[in-house]
A protein has these predicted regions:
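Active-site and adjacent substrate-binding regions of carbohydrate-active enzymes
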Residues: 1-249
C-alpha cells in the first residue's frame, strides 16, 4: 500500500466496495510505515478496508535509526518484546495482526533472531512458538519450517539481488567502505539470504532441480533439508505442524 495521505482511507474503501467485496477472499496490505493506530483503522472489523496488514516495526530494530537497513546495530530484546506487545494490545478487539518473522525481502529468521550454531533447532522452535502463540494470522516463509539460514558468500558476484549489488557499488566505490565492511551488512540483511533454492534433500542441487539454479545453494543443504526434517520426529518441521494443529484445535 502507498504511504497514507488525506484520501487514503477513502480510496481504500472504494477499492473494497468496487473490487474486494465481490470476492470471497482474505485481504492483506503491505504497510511499512503504518502505526498501530493506522493499522487499527485499516483493519477494523466494522469500518476497515482490509482484513490485515503487514507492519514492519520489528523489521527495523537491528538497523541504526535513520541510516537505512544496512547500518547494523545489535537487536535489543526488550525493544522487540515491547514492539510485539504494542501491536498485540493495540489491535486486540478491533483489528487483526499479520504475524511473520521473514519473507522474500528479509533475511532468514533463525539467522536474524535466533542462532545458527548448536542452538539452531531450539531457537527456531522458540521463534515458531512466539509467532504462533500471538493473536493474528501466522505467515510461514518457505524454508522457515526447516530452519534454513542466511548464506555468507564472500564475493559480490555471487549475489543476484539488484538492491544488494547497487548498495555494494555505492558503498565501496563512492563512500570508501571496505569490501568486508559491506559484506558484513549483506550477510546480515541481503535479500538473497531468503531467495536461495529450497532445500528438499541432500541430493544434487538439494533436490531442487536437475539443472543449474539461478542462485547458488546454501552450503548447509546436506544437513538442513525437508527430507531430513520429515524423517526426524523432533525436527523443526514437525514442531511447526504441532503448533498449527494446536491453533486449529
Amino acid at each position: 500500500m502507498v504511504t497514507q495521505g488525506p484520501r487514503f482511507m477513502a480510496c481504500m474503501h472504494e477499492m473494497k466496495r468496487e473490487v474486494l467485496d465481490h470476492y470471497d477472499c482474505i485481504t492483506v496490505g503491505e504497510a511499512p510505515c503504518a502505526t498501530v493506530e493506522q493499522a487499527q483503522e485499516i483493519t477494523d472489523s466494522n469500518t476497515g478496508a482490509l482484513n490485515m496488514v503487514f507492519q514492519f516495526e520489528h523489521m527495523d530494530m537491528d538497523s541504526q535509526p535513520g541510516k537505512g537497513k544496512w547500518a547494523l546495530k545489535p537487536l535489543h530484546l526488550p525493544d522487540l518484546k515491547a514492539s510485539l506487545s504494542r501491536w498485540q494490545t493495540g489491535l486486540h478487539g478491533t483489528g487483526w495482526n499479520s504475524l511473520y518473522w521473514c519473507n522474500h525481502d528479509q533475511p532468514r529468521a533463525v539467522s536474524r533472531f535466533g542462532d545458527t550454531g548448536i542452538h539452531r533447532v531450539r531457537s527456531a522452535k522458540m521463534l515458531a512458538t512466539c509467532l504462533h502463540m500471538m493473536q493474528g494470522t501466522p505467515f510461514i516463509y518457505q524454508g522457515e519450517e526447516l530452519g534454513m539460514t542466511n548464506v555468507a558468500w564472500q564475493h559480490i558476484e555471487a549475489y543476484q539481488d539488484i538492491e544488494t549489488r547497487n548498495m555494494y557499488a555505492q558503498a565501496v566505490n563512492h563512500k570508501g567502505l571496505s569490501h568486508q565492511e559491506v559484506m558484513t551488512s549483506i550477510h546480515a540483511k541481503g535479500r538473497d539470504n531468503a531467495r536461495t533454492p529450497m532445500q528438499w534433500s541432500a541430493a544434487h542441487q538439494a533436490g531442487f532441480t536437475t539443472g543449474s539454479p539461478w542462485l547458488a545453494l546454501n552450503n548447509n543443504f546436506a544437513q538442513v533439508n525437508a527430507q531430513q526434517a520429515l524423517a526426524d520426529p523432533d525436527s523443526i518441521f514437525h514442531y511447526y505442524r504441532q503448533l498449527i494443529s494446536l491453533r486449529q484445535s
